[in-house]
């Protein structure tokens, strides 16, 4: 069985074609600058052979047509025809309160995704465009929506409710939802395997650190607390997002700077975080380099980022009543030894110690803690696409009859 995994953004479309017989990616690709000048599609095959093509991509439908062309290309492709694609798995950022698991896409599911547009205005509309475009190009192919929020549905009400008038929750669904769920789920499962323990006996804190960052407390394979909230703006400081701040700061800035609600939203989401503090960059490599050369604002930005995460780790150890492992994943979590070192410095009092040499190793699953540490520190590259493909396969095997004669 072959599953096409789609992650549609506002001007980009990431995809992977995964052969589920051995869970290997046959091709990984990206359409960039959709609806903008100088659009490009790049695709890398399992054997390293790479296609790069500049072409006009005015919308997501045209982009997906180019994806199919690339996958079936006589020189760079990996399948003979589109009929070899048995199912499509779509990443959908927000499932609201309706979805606690992945779902076979039908009219009801599509409407529920649209109902969440106001909860995730930057993400759900392009996710839906990806779904609609796929349905036009591949009619009859079963499609599954995998929600970023679904993993966090096990968070208890006392953790997800805000101390606001209850009717605001009843009227508008204002509560913590959490995000990056697919990533947190994957690495928590891998952590249990690396620890050699049954999933139900493991307590881990998973740190998904990228331009957007979130931390999750996972107990017995279930999310019981997470840093992102009603939107991905809540939580730790991030690349361009401020994270949690005193809410009274918002009207204060609006009044002083004469900003509209849209402008203050842009300021907090796109001009804050380490970019805002450093006045330099949201790329942590740039900040590391600048800090090493004495740039004090770059150093402060890195200190704030690490401190906020360290504080959450302490908080979540209390929430979990102890922890077996701290897990680092995503772009920064997997690749930045210096950030991991900053976060975990001076935590030996609670059993967290890292091996400096192991901490430098990149691109693989590894335990970087010292032998005498009582809490393991694991670096686990995330694989959201494989998780989406697995869910898609499982739902297709139980809920639909695949149209292809290719055996599952």
UniProtKB/Swiss-Prot annotation:
Keywords: ATP-binding, Cytoplasm, Kinase, Magnesium, Metal-binding, Nucleotide-binding, Transferase
Gene3D superfamilies membership: 3.30.420.40
GO terms for cellular component: cytoplasm
Any single biological process term in GO: acetyl-CoA biosynthetic process
InterPro entries in alphabetical order: Ac/propionate_kinase (IPR004372), Aliphatic_acid_kin_short-chain (IPR000890), Aliphatic_acid_kinase_CS (IPR023865), ATPase_NBD (IPR043129)
Residues the record lists as binding Mg(2+): 7, 384
Binding site for substrate: 91
Pathway: Metabolic intermediate biosynthesis; acetyl-CoA biosynthesis; acetyl-CoA from acetate: step 1/2
Binding site for ATP: 14, 208-212, 283-285, 331-335
Catalytic reaction equation(s): acetate + ATP = acetyl phosphate + ADP
Compartments reported by the entry: Cytoplasm
Coiled coil: none
Enzyme class: transferase
Protein name: Acetate kinase
Species in which this protein is naturally found: Methanosarcina mazei (strain ATCC BAA-159 / DSM 3647 / Goe1 / Go1 / JCM 11833 / OCM 88)
